[in-house]
Amino acid sequence: MPIAPSTYYDHINREPSRRELRDGELKEHISRVHAANYGVYGARKVWLTLNREGIEVARCTVERLMTKLGLSGTTRGKARRTTIADPATARPADLVQRRFGPPAPNRLWVADLTYVSTWAGFAYVAFVTDAYARRILGWRVASTMATSMVLDAIEQAIWTRQQESVLDLKDVIHHTDRGSQYTSIRFSERLAEAGIQPSVGAVGSSYDNALAETINGLYKTELIKPGKPWRSIEDVELATARWVDWFNHRRLYQYCGDVPPVELEAAYYAQRQRPAAG
């Protein structure tokens, strides 16, 4: 059906509606939040972030506008196992038995390592994570998958807690899979010096250290795969430092009640410092 010229020009010259103006503003905020969080947030986390910032908006509106913008979240793939067991080395008992929900910080630390392909060869990455709030306490990037790398990661974890005046680590269980780096004499001696109890998965399945592998999977999905190709180990190290800071302080983690790990830890300690009611 033909459209009268006056109707056409009225349409293109009309003032935008309030909804259109609001949508335009929200699109800018949505794009900003999505980009600031490594492009990994879906509509739910973008919506939560906007509301945390004081920008009140319905989740369905965020979903609608993200569709228009062509934005979506990421889905974590299946992680590959990296550690290799040493059958000749004695292993500590499994003190965790796949229970990864401790009642407080500094009860269970989990550790694992993964690798990143670069133009200069493989970069190996080790993480130490406190299971209570899924906070990464220590990490290290190295060119070899050696005991020194996991030692550096545990040293950083110990140092992190020392900066927070946590000096007594006797209640900490350090849980890993059967990788030879974690069952070496040097590593076992360092845990003993710190008063940390070692634990190694009993069965040898990925489920034995599922939380640590989850952290590795998020790292690969949120940072490594979107950032390919990686030119050097140094590039991986710098990017990992930024990602860990974001992960701990800004990333909304569903397990933590959709707050960052550091925020959940702070809430735990604040609750303990409150005087009892009555």
UniProtKB/Swiss-Prot annotation:
Name used for this protein in its record: Putative transposase for insertion sequence element IS986/IS6110
GO biological process, one term: DNA recombination
Gene Ontology molecular function terms on file: DNA binding
Domain (Integrase catalytic) ranges: 101-268
Pfam family, one: rve
Record keywords: DNA recombination, DNA-binding, Transposable element, Transposition
Database matches in InterPro entries: HTH-like_dom (IPR025948), Integrase_cat-core (IPR001584), RNaseH-like_sf (IPR012337), RNaseH_sf (IPR036397), Transpos_IS3 (IPR048020), Transposase_IS3/IS150/IS904 (IPR050900)
Gene3D superfamilies referenced in this protein's UniProt entry, alphabetically: Ribonuclease H-like superfamily/Ribonuclease H (3.30.420.10)
Top-level lineage group: Bacteria
Source species: Mycobacterium tuberculosis (strain CDC 1551 / Oshkosh)
Record bears the keyword DNA-binding: yes
Described function: Involved in the transposition of the insertion sequence.
Alphabetized PANTHER family for the sequence: TRANSPOSASE INSF FOR INSERTION SEQUENCE IS3B-RELATED (PTHR46889), TRANSPOSASE INSO FOR INSERTION SEQUENCE ELEMENT IS911B-RELATED (PTHR46889:SF4)
